[in-house]
Amino acid sequence: MTDLTASSLRALKLMDLTTLNDDDTNEKVIALCHQAKTPVGNTAAVCIYPRFIPIARKTLNAQGTPDVRIATVTNFPHGNDDIEIALAETRAAIAYGADEVDVVFPYRALIAGNEQVGFDLVKACKDACAAANVLLKVIIETGELKEEALIRKASEISIKAGADFIKTSTGKVPVNATPESARIMMEVIRDMGVSKTVGFKPAGGVRTAEDAQQFLAIADDLFGADWADSRHYRFGASSLLASLLKTLGHGDGKSASAY
């Protein structure tokens, strides 16, 4: 098995296979759930808008893949600083049956100098998730924060407020996951001594088997080869799946999606 083949198989099983488009339909979500079941194993999760959680659950159960988790998004993609709205959306997502919630950190407030609202928003959502045994991922929007100090600060605040994962991006801004931002965020996990309990998710812009290999190599470098399991590492992507499957000898590498 080549290094790229091995990393592709790892990456596939760490994917949050994603569709977060304005024109999403039940049919598109059903198709996504079908794609999550591949000839070489299942993706870790599907990531969809909250209203599609019931149809996703039904589809995943019907095809014999109930272990594929259902992730959804809240405070998305804008990352506003209204805690009550973010919390209400998170509670609604839990009520729909989400296994995991990816909430957008109020990154513009942090850029403006307000650290407290980010902590309070994440903590409120974490408390709701913890009560329901739901995993919380916090999207810090690295491509908008831009500066290393802000990326580091948003990561630290999110972790202190209870994030189970820190995630780079919504996939809805010009710059999404980059190797540079990934390393900064994972260094925070290392430096805070929380690698047992906090994971990392690059999202948006991870499109090829080679991209995935590069991102996994950073995790392996910082934490060793055994750390990046589905509790500690996810890829938020859709078009990546076709590239991984092609590398693994299945399909032509073409995808209908650009996420």
UniProtKB/Swiss-Prot annotation:
Alphabetized GO MF terms: deoxyribose-phosphate aldolase activity
Keywords for this protein: Cytoplasm, Lyase, Schiff base
Active site, per annotation: D102 (proton donor/acceptor), K167 (schiff-base intermediate with acetaldehyde), K201 (proton donor/acceptor)
Catalytic activities: 2-deoxy-D-ribose 5-phosphate = D-glyceraldehyde 3-phosphate + acetaldehyde
A matching Pfam family: DeoC
EC number: 4.1.2.4
UniProt GO BP: 2-deoxyribose 1-phosphate catabolic process; carbohydrate catabolic process; deoxyribonucleotide catabolic process
A Gene Ontology term for the protein's cellular component: cytoplasm
Localization in the cell: Cytoplasm
Pathway: Carbohydrate degradation; 2-deoxy-D-ribose 1-phosphate degradation; D-glyceraldehyde 3-phosphate and acetaldehyde from 2-deoxy-alpha-D-ribose 1-phosphate: step 2/2
Family per record: Belongs to the DeoC/FbaB aldolase family. DeoC type 2 subfamily.
HAMAP family: DeoC_type2
Name used for this protein in its record: Deoxyribose-phosphate aldolase
Classification of source organism: Bacteria, Pseudomonadati, Pseudomonadota, Gammaproteobacteria, Enterobacterales
